[in-house]
Design a protein with these regions (language model features):
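N-terminal secretory targeting modules
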Residues: 1-157, 265, 271, 275, ...
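Cell-envelope and extracellular/periplasmic
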Residues: 190-197, 217-227, 257-258, 288, ...
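Substrate-gating cap/lid alpha-helix
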Residues: 264-305, 328
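Histidine-centered active-site loop/cap adjacent to the catalytic His
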Residues: 315-345
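A short helix->loop->beta-strand "cap" motif at the edges of active sites that frequently abuts
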Residues: 248-252
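Alpha-helical scaffolding segments of alpha/beta enzyme cores, especially the outer helices
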Residues: 233-236, 240-247, 286-293, 328
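Serine-esterase "nucleophile elbow" of acetyl-processing enzymes
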Residues: 126-195, 203-212
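Oxyanion-hole/transition-state-stabilizing segment in secreted/luminal serine hydrolases
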Residues: 181, 200-235, 259-264
Length: 345
């Protein structure tokens, strides 16, 4: 049985409103105005349209689910996949990852087993790829399966960041540090991580002003170190972003740019044409220190540093960890910050 995107039993979770009027849906995170704002910045534009942190939800007892995708495109040369979570009677989640979709483009059907039996109605959540883009043309379940709509979730955590927040470079949507802590803290989240983005307050204003947020985390600054011209503006732009966050959030956390191997002259010498040398490492260190000094003037902002090991082997491409590294990031943040009881459901 194939359900079209217009079927009300399918619930789409995305920061932007979902247009169900056509035979396909794209789960968008950012409004068009942000694309216009960042025009000319090649890195961010390639990542703005990903459906990182977006999902399809339904209640079913089908033993399998097929996600029908079209116009699947890959923007980075790393493995990408979708993933399925099935809620268990005790409230935990059984997880299933797809194979690597990087080997496919265009029209792709992804079959995911649920392990469910007839009459065993459970909440199922299908998570979209972290970096690749696609439209959803439908979801299929077994012909005799029962299907109901899953209650919508109101997000209570806004995660603002760059490629580390987006999840570069892990294959599974479940492996990003945001997803790990979303489940641990029981805080439905909007993941607004954008690989390559600078500290751009106006790119996130719309999200911060969308509602009152119990928690906002910000993990930006590394990309300001790529050029000398963007180092000096980092602290001032951070202050503008923090002012916006404090006006719209109960708790604000800033994760400073983590250590990079190039700061010690280690790791690869370049990343997609960008030099990873000591000069670049020195600029990132300067940005980190400038942020530390400026953010110290905000007593209510929790500033967290050094969330990743100083070991170049954790960063295969010189900048990003794999799933194990994201687990370490999540563990470190959880050990040093706890959302208030009012935030956690």
């Amino acid at each position: 049985m194939r359900l079209s995107p217009s079927d009300p039993r399918l619930c789409f979770n995305a920061p932007q409103a979902v247009d169900r009027s056509r035979g396909e849906v794209r789960l968008e995170r950012f409004p068009p105005a942000v694309t216009k704002l960042l025009m000319g910045q090649i890195g961010p534009l390639a990542n703005l349209r990903s459906s990182c942190g977006c999902s399809i939800r339904l209640l079913t007892d089908s033993p399998w689910i097929i996600l029908h995708l079209d116009r699947l495109r890959h923007h980075q040369p790393i493995p990408q996949g979708v993933a399925l979570e099935i809620k268990q009677p005790d409230g935990t989640w059984l997880t299933v990852d797809s194979s690597d979709l990087r080997e496919h483009e265009g029209v792709v059907d992804v079959r995911l087993p649920t392990g469910l039996c007839a009459g065993e109605l459970s909440e199922c959540v299908v998570w979209m790829p972290l970096l690749s883009t696609a439209v959803i043309t439908g979801v299929s379940v077994a012909d005799d399966a029962h299907i109901e709509s899953s209650p919508e979730e109101t997000p209570s955590w806004l995660a603002i960041g760059d490629s580390l927040t987006q999840g570069f470079s892990t294959q599974s949507p479940l492996s990003s540090w945001v997803h790990r802590l979303m489940r641990q803290w029981k805080l439905p989240a909007w993941n607004l991580g954008v690989g390559g983005i600078l500290i751009e307050p106006e790119a996130f204003r719309w999200a911060l002003e969308a509602q009152r947020w119990p928690l906002v985390t910000i993990a930006l600054g590394s990309n300001n170190g790529w050029r000398e011209s963007t180092v000096d503006c980092a602290a001032d732009n951070a202050a503008l972003l923090v002012d916006l966050a404090l006006a719209n959030a109960d708790q604000v956390v800033w994760c400073l740019p983590p250590w990079k191997p190039m700061e010690d002259g280690k790791g690869p010498t370049e990343f997609m044409g960008i030099p990873l040398d000591r000069d670049t490492g020195s600029r990132i260190a300067r940005v980190r220190e400038a942020l530390r000094v400026r953010l110290a003037t905000y007593p209510s902002v929790v500033v967290i540093d050094d969330l990743m090991p100083h070991d170049h082997r954790w960063y295969p491409d010189g900048l990003h960890p794999f799933a194990w590294g994201f687990a370490r990031f999540a563990e470190g943040l959880a050990a040093r910050f706890h959302p208030t009881a009012a935030s956690v459901r």
